[in-house]
Amino acid sequence: VGISTFYRLLEEHGTAQCALEHLPEVARAAGVDNYIPHGEEHVIAEMRRGQKAGAHLIFRGTPAYPAGFNDLNDAPPFFWAVGDPTLLHRPTLGLVGARNASSLGTGMSRFLATTLGEEGYVICSGLARGVDTAAHAAAIGTGTIAVLGGGVDVVYPAENAQLTRQIRENGLLILNNPWEPNPKRGISPYAIG
């Protein structure tokens, strides 16, 4: 269930529990036969697996949820976080750019991330090669958030393994699922508000 469908089901059925109970008929109406929702034991196992990976859930409507996300039309109802969630409540700027960036591009990314970080901004990017990598590396000491398209158990790109560890320890990773095995180039789960 995607974000738009989640909110539509919630609006139609009033509560998440009621929406879950109606999922099989919603799936049938969408042409999906024999849909069987996961049981409570699966949900508990997923939660434990996330906690074991060092991740915790942040739900919309809780104090940990970033206020800026509420302004998004497709604000995630929840997401996983690994690292320092207090970074979500500081002023944040996104720095993204070319994966195959020139030395001028990566140099400018480092300069902007350093300068803005010193002014109190958290730098947010997607941990891709090039500009993203340069921005995160420069902002480790002042605050950085990496928005991942995959999970914490598969680093993509592989050359960012050490940077990912540093962000886990000194920044924040946010993601849809803490163990999605197949991150895909160009996929970022959310826009940072």
List the model feature ranges, each with a label.
Residues 57-193:
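Glycine-biased, small-residue-rich flexible motifs in mid-sequence functional cores and linkers
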Residues 1-62:
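Short, small/acidic-rich helices and loops at N termini and domain boundaries
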